[in-house]
């Protein structure tokens, strides 16, 4: 059987799994639709959040912009991550405390102002459409590669799938499908890392492999550590002036 047929089978099974989870966890109340009923286990929430972070609009895009723009691209990474942390710490807990489902509802009731509510709606729309544009583009690129269709068709396929389980299951369905997505993603990320670490250092644990020596062609230690090799990569990419610590912060940003 050709590789393309196996790809179609794998994609079909994964889609069926996500749709099955959405049907199983479909929302039966307004609270379940907006906040998954408030009863999702913290570990499951963490897995869903991690899967959302490892998506086309965040992790892949951040890696891409750093690859194309070099050190200047890290500004977007710090802003994205910092804003995410601030949102999780300063806003999300109070939504639950006030019993609200959306940020505009919380802002409007917190400041007793419909004008503030309108501003929050406008900001939410701008942020959401910006995020969705990147996410859907990434989905289209992935589907165009795997299903051998054009990017526009891939975008529409992704939209139909997301629309199905989002409308049917709400946040509850999305959360549990993201948990399944996390399992797929973490497997896809860890397997290459484990085998690369095993091939380069002879240690199957990537975190421990950082302190090991790079193996030579005969499988013996070369006397050069992995960290030294990574430092050499930083120098080759032009990051040395910003990581060696020999200049002041003012000089680096000037």
Q: Which positions does each model-derived feature cover?
A:
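Membrane-embedded alpha-helical core segments of multi-pass
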Residues: 13, 17, 58, 83-90, ...
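Transmembrane helix-loop junctions and nearby membrane-interface residues
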Residues: 19-26, 63, 135, 142, ...
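Alpha-helical transmembrane segments of polytopic integral membrane proteins
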Residues: 26-27, 56-59, 63, 88, ...
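Membrane-interface "cap" regions at the ends of multi-pass membrane proteins
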Residues: 1-59, 166-169, 212, 220
């Amino acid at each position: 059987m050709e590789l393309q047929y196996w790809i179609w089978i794998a994609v079909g099974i994964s889609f069926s799994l996500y749709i099955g989870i959405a049907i199983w966890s479909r929302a039966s109340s307004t609270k379940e639709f907006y906040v998954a009923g408030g009863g999702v286990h913290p570990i499951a929430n963490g897995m869903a959040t991690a899967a959302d972070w490892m998506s086309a609009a965040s992790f892949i895009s951040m890696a891409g912009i750093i690859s194309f723009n070099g050190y200047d691209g890290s500004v977007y990474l710090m802003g994205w991550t910092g804003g995410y942390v601030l949102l999780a710490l300063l806003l999300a807990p109070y939504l639950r405390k006030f019993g609200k489902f959306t940020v505009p509802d919380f802002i409007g009731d917190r400041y007793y102002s419909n004008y503030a509510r309108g501003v929050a709606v406008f900001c939410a729309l701008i942020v959401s459409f910006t995020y969705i544009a990147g996410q859907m583009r990434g989905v289209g690129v992935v589907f165009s590669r795997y299903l051998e269709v054009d990017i526009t068709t891939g975008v529409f396929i992704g939209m139909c799938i997301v629309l199905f389980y989002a409308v049917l299951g709400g946040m509850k369905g999305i959360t549990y499908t993201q948990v399944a997505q996390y399992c797929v993603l973490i497997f896809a990320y860890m397997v290459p890392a484990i085998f690369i670490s095993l091939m380069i250092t002879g240690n199957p644990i990537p975190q421990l492999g950082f302190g090991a020596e790079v193996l030579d062609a005969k499988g013996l230690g070369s006397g050069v550590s992995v960290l030294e090799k990574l430092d050499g990569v930083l120098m080759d990419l032009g990051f040395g002036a910003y990581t060696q610590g020999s200049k002041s912060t003012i000089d680096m940003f000037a």
